[in-house]
Amino acid sequence: MEEFQRYLELDRSQQHYFLYPLIFQEYIYALAHDHGLNINRSILLENAGYDNKFSLLIVKRLIARMYQQNHLILSTNDSNQNRFLRRNKNLYSQMISEGFAVIVEIPFYLQLKSSLESKGIVKSHNLRSIHSIFPFLEDKISHLIYGLEILIPYPVHLEILVQTLRYWVKDASSLHLLRFFLHEYCNWNTPNKAGSSFSKRNQRLFFLLYNSHLCEYESIFIFLRNQSSHLRSTSSGTLLERIYFYGKIKYLVKVFVKAFQVNLLLLKDPFMHYVRYQGKSILASKGTPFLMKKWTYYFVNLWQCHFYLWSQPGRICINQLYNHSLDILGYLSSARLNPSMVRGQMLENSFLIDNAINKFDAIVPIIPLIGSLAKAKFCNVLGHPISKAVWTDLSDSDIIDQFGRICRNLSHYHSGSSQKKSLYRIKYILRLSCARTLARKHKSTVRAFLKRLGSGLLEEFFTAEEQVLYLTFPRASSASQRLYRRRIWYLDIICINDLANHE
């Protein structure tokens, strides 16, 4: 019991990070800008134009205004007094929030780096890939029976997010600045335009706050999981495990000291796996329905009693994995039964053995993907290709390059699909949409345009993935064709593309 209590006690000896002076450093904003260029660029090449507005001159002007304290009046109610944000309010606010997100990430990065070094993990780049979750599911989920699909609740009050960072960052000035950003978009956590504006314009800060909030409750869950399971967490522990908890965990210490062993007996499960993606998580187990209901009540009580988050039991669904598909990151994944028959013979007697095993299957959901294409104006809601009117002012090569880029990214991201027919249909829609866009630009019909220039004009970017496989296996074209039909998971995909993100 003393070991458990030491684990849950608050340790603040390594949390004295004073980050506010970094707000006035120019290189912080340069780092934030480079991160935005490399990571958050849209697959559709359509952005808000922030890249064009960034310059060191604007950064110097921004820092000069912040040094003038009489101009730094953080009042969102009186527009006459708010001279700091009156001119270029959106640009300055976005630049400060992005720079602030880079600064607040420093304590988390230091903690993660020390954790990786202590556990002897030199490189963790592959763990960042979105596709790394699918080989894990392919290896584990086929042996499990039940799965909890959990819709993670979000804080209903902004101060909860501030309190989450309070024990990571011992800097009152930084926390006050964080409160200003949150209250400037006071309704960011509600489904309205203000919330959408905050999450889109301040993605890095938004994801940092959200992930730090998730880290709080997952750290407790992983602690319980490690104590109640014979299997120790490895990679997930590296990324999520944390020993710093805030004050209300002291109440949990008393509870665990009194009834810790009883609680663990109720949640005992030697085969249990947990995966989180976006705002959902999956808890897969080989246990019984009774055990899964116990975990459901545990999550609901943990959120409501210790994190003050209201969550109804209906947000957690118990499903049998072999007859239910999981909507995960643009894929429909399931562990379907794969029947097989084995013929055996013993002396003069022959017999047949029916054997059915669970096989992990991942397919591309065609209907949501067509909906994303229709929203992006590549087709209508029925999937009929249309021209992209906003691109008709571009040159022919630029139009083909943009369509080709989208098609290659979709092929790259959905390479793990076990059924390629849906992906071929998406390629056909993009190909015909590209032809219609070019024909509209030249005021011609698609048939006349392709007849004049040749149908091979649009072939190059639809066969890019096959060409890569042929270069990889030059002596065995049949092997490369079989490989192309199989699932391929890439470990260099660190962001989900816009069209696959139907959520």
From Swiss-Prot:
Signal peptide: none annotated. Pfam families: Intron_maturas2, MatK_N. GO terms for cellular component: chloroplast. GO terms for biological process: mRNA processing; RNA splicing; tRNA processing. InterPro entries: Domain_X, Maturase_MatK, Maturase_MatK_N. One of its GO terms (molecular function) is RNA binding. This is Maturase K. It comes from Panax ginseng (Korean ginseng). The gene is matK.
